[in-house]
């Protein structure tokens, strides 16, 4: 390569193709071991450079330079490296031809970089070893190549090759890097052994508890092996995730599980190659989740999570444009220990069986338009042994998978995509009966005879399919339309995620946009969406109409306005296994205002409200502010406060032959007045680029008061017969429960009012003490208190969360990177 620097940059933002406000020069060199990049970023006022110091991959709010290589020249995958003006490194891997979607920040190669600010602006140097890149074996390399400089104080994004914002594609539009010759492709072998120790300290210690204050020490290892120039095996043995941030608190009154984000690095890295657009065949949080069973006794040592004995995955993309993702994992049998005071004995009970998982995903790219055809297969097997409590609860085997496709033309402007898949679960009739009665199916619905509920069934098979058409590019109008379905027997919740089967879903959307700056706005977008569902009985079970407006002002502030209308439909899940019930017409709006993305002090504010025709309502305030008082400090506060009344909250089902109008059962509902408030807080301090202290805390308070209890008057209606009228009685007892006398057998309802306080925090000292090697010191708190009061909580209760009883978790983990010379 010549001596002349690369400096012909142009704006992508704020004005596509515009002249840069500042000059940039980049030089590239290489030797047998590494590629070197030197850069000069000019600034007329160097004091304006944002240079916040943070941990690795945390430089989004600082001015930075990024280089991305498409080493296989496939127009789809890429390796990105960036350096901020403060010298903070960042890196990620692109698994798709998209700047943001499919970008994996968990990609952490070992490379070197430095930066310095001077009177002309700032300079940067990078050294990227060829061992950290995968590229084909060839005498002369030809790579896709892109440079990007981000100046947040100006909201200005400069690119060497300007990527059009009105069209699809990112990596496929890169320029070309040539001139690298005589470099050998290396198949890396990297080992990362670790040692960790942790201890739990309860706030209130019962000295008679033999399981008090447990302490553990363990060792494990991660490993990475290169296969050829395209594929990589990652393996982990006895992994430790003690440094991972805790999940947020909530009070879930629905019939459906809460889906939480995956934060464990082994499962997030390469995750894009283990999923498809559409069916959630694989939900990695299933591996190593909390045991399905629990035990009771005088003193109990209940495992918080199943132990992952080991896992391995194969990821990459071959020269023939075949993307490969495969994962194998095994969790060990989990035992809970119970100590009996009377017998002075400790017994052990199996609460989770040994379980094996397998996931395979292949996707072949076809033709010049980058159309794709792929397939996926997921399998799970549990060793239930001779444990009747396990066989009655859990399926022994589960399989799912299918094929998917995306046909593109006019360079991705138009596309038709779809999928077709299956599921199959096997197990004891009691376990399969639980699946049939679960919230995803409700086979037992008395008005759903076509569902064929069979309590003797020992397996369940179902299918899913979808077809979608999209216009993904163009200056002014984008649109999409989709129809999808899941049959009643479709079930993937052993390894994947499914909220509801037996649906025919439809979705149509159109967007009208302007990406060029105007007199008052930099850009704007209007969207209209209609979506909904029918079940296989022909009932319209869900409907939603939504209109949105997204505006970006000349000062880079943005305003989002959303209006939603949900027509009345017949819901097949509200009665939780009972007959269809009509929902009320509901409507609402959401307003969001955000500061400029590159502001030194960033903020956002939002308000949303909703109403329904049955007397329900919602009003919620939220927001956030991020303050950087100095380059080393960062403080973020995200307050939220919501008041609502749910007009049809399910309470319980009471069997009563006298309730002939509702198939011999009474389906009870109530109004619930709810208040929820929380304050997510983050405080980060960077001692240096390699030594950081990060703190996270979330005080959370919630309350709920049930009133207006009644029973569904008739199927396919929303009408309730309120207790205390029409010849019925309801009496509040001294313990808070209710004695109810309907027009039939009397019964008692427990007190469901609640006040919940929760405080979860996570403080992590992270020191990258050697290249690729890290020391973590972690302190976590998990405090919780609950009472059956139903008194509205307020912001003052957030202080009370810190005084609730709970546990302190202390952990120390040290890893050491051991590169083994790979073969070429």
Where is each model-derived feature located?
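Alpha-helix capping and helix-loop boundary segments enriched in small/acidic/polar residues
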Residues: 210-211, 254, 302, 346-353, ...
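Structural preference for beta-rich elements and adjacent junctions enriched in aromatics
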Residues: 1-365, 371-375, 384-387, 804
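A generic structural micro-feature
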Residues: 18-20, 59, 304, 395, ...
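Surface-exposed extracellular loop regions of Gram-negative outer-membrane beta-barrel proteins
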Residues: 185-234, 360-451, 509, 516, ...
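Exposed, low-structure sequence patches enriched in small/polar residues
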Residues: 307, 315, 415-417, 421-824
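Generic structural hydrophobic/aromatic packing signal, biased to beta-strands
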Residues: 26-28, 37-39, 65-69, 81-83, ...
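Short coil turns and loop connectors of transmembrane beta-barrels in diderm outer membranes
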Residues: 33, 43, 75, 120, ...
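Short, glycine-/Ser/Thr-/acidic-enriched flexible segments
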Residues: 42-43, 72-74, 150-152, 196-200, ...
């Amino acid at each position: 390569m010549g001596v002349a620097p690369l400096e012909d940059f142009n704006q992508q933002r704020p004005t596509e193709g515009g002249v840069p406000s500042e000059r940039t020069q980049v030089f590239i060199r290489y030797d047998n071991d590494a590629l070197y990049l030197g850069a000069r970023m000019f600034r007329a006022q160097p004091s304006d450079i944002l240079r916040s110091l943070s941990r690795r991959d945390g430089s989004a709010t600082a001015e930075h330079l990024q280089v991305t290589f498409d080493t296989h020249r496939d127009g789809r995958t890429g390796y990105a490296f960036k350096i901020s003006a403060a010298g903070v490194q960042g890196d990620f891997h692109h698994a798709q031809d998209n700047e943001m979607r499919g970008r994996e920040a968990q990609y952490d190669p070992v490379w070197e970089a430095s930066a310095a600010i001077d009177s002309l602006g700032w300079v940067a140097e990078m050294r990227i070893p060829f061992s950290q890149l995968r590229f084909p074996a060839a005498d002369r390399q030809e790579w896709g190549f892109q440079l990007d400089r981000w100046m947040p104080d100006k909201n200005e994004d400069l690119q060497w090759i300007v990527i059009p914002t009105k069209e699809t594609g990112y990596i496929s539009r890169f320029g070309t890097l040539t001139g690298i010759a005589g470099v050998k492709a290396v198949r890396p072998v990297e080992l990362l052994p670790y040692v960790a120790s942790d201890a739990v300290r309860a706030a209130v210690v019962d000295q008679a508890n033999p399981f008090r204050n447990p302490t553990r020490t363990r060792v494990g290892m991660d490993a990475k092996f290169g296969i050829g120039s395209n594929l990589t095996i990652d393996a982990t043995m006895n992994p430790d995730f003690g440094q991972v941030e805790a999940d947020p608190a909530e009070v879930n009154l629905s019939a459906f599980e809460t889906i939480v984000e995956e934060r464990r690095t082994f499962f997030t890295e390469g995750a894009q190659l283990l999923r498809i657009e559409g069916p959630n065949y694989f939900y990695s949080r299933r591996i190593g989740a909390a045991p399905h069973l629990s035990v009771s006794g005088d003193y109990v040592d209940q495992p918080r999570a199943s132990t992952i004995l080991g896992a391995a995955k194969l990821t990459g993309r071959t020269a023939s444009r075949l993307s490969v993702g495969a994962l194998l994992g095994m969790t060990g049998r989990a035992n809970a220990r119970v100590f009996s005071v009377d017998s002075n004995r400790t017994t052990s009970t199996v609460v989770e069986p040994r379980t094996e998982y397998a996931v395979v995903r292949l996707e072949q790219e076809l033709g010049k338009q980058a159309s794709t055809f792929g397939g996926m297969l997921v399998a799970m097997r549990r060793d239930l042994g001779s444990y009747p409590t396990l066989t009655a609860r859990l399926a022994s085997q589960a399989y799912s998978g299918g094929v998917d496709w995306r046909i593109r033309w006019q360079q991705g402007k138009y596309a038709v995509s779809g999928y077709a898949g299956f599921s199959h679960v096997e197990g004891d009739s009691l376990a399969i009966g639980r699946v049939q009665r679960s919230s995803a199916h409700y086979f037992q619905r008395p008005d759903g005879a076509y569902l064929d509920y069979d309590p003797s069934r020992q397996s369940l098979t179902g299918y899913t399919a979808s077809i979608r058409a999209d216009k993904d590019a163009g200056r002014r109008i984008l649109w999409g339309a989709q129809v999808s379905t899941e049959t009643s027997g479709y079930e993937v919740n052993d390894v994947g995620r499914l909220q509801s089967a037996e649906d025919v879903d439809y979705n149509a959307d159109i967007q009208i946009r302007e990406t060029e700056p105007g007199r008052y706005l930099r850009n704007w977008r209007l969207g209209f969406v209609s979506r909904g569902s029918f079940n296989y009985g022909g009932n319209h079970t869900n409907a939603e109409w939504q209109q949105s407006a997204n505006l970006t002002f000349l000062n880079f502030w943005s305003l989002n306005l959303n209006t939603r209308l949900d027509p009345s439909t017949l819901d097949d899940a509200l009665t939780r296994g009972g007959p269809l019930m009509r929902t009320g017409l509901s409507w609402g709006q959401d307003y969001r205002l955000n500061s400029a993305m590159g502001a030194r002090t960033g903020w956002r504010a939002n308000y949303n409200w909703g109403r329904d025709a049955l007397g329900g309502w919602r009003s919620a305030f939220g927001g956030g502010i991020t303050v950087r008082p100095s380059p080393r400090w960062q403080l973020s506060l995200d307050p939220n406060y919501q008041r609502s009344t749910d007009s049809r909250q399910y309470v319980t089902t009471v069997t009563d032959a006298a309730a002939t109008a509702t198939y011999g059962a009474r389906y009870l509902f109530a109004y619930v007045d709810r208040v929820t408030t929380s304050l997510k807080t983050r405080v980060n301090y960077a001692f240096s680029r390699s030594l950081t202290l990060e703190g996270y805390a979330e005080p959370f308070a919630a309350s709920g008061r049930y009133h207006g209890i009644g029973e569904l008057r008739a199927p396919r209606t929303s009408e309730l017969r309120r207790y205390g009228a029409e010849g019925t009685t309801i009496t509040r007892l001294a313990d808070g429960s209710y004695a109810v006398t309907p027009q039939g057998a009397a019964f008692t309802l427990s007190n469901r009012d609640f006040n919940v306080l929760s405080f979860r925090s996570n403080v992590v000292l992270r020191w990258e003490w050697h290249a690729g090697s890290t020391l973590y010191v972690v302190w976590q708190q998990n405090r919780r208190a609950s009472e059956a009061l139903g008194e509205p909580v307020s912001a003052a209760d957030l202080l009370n969360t810190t005084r609730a009883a709970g546990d302190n978790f202390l952990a120390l983990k040290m890893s050491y990177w051991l590169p083994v010379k790979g073969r070429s």
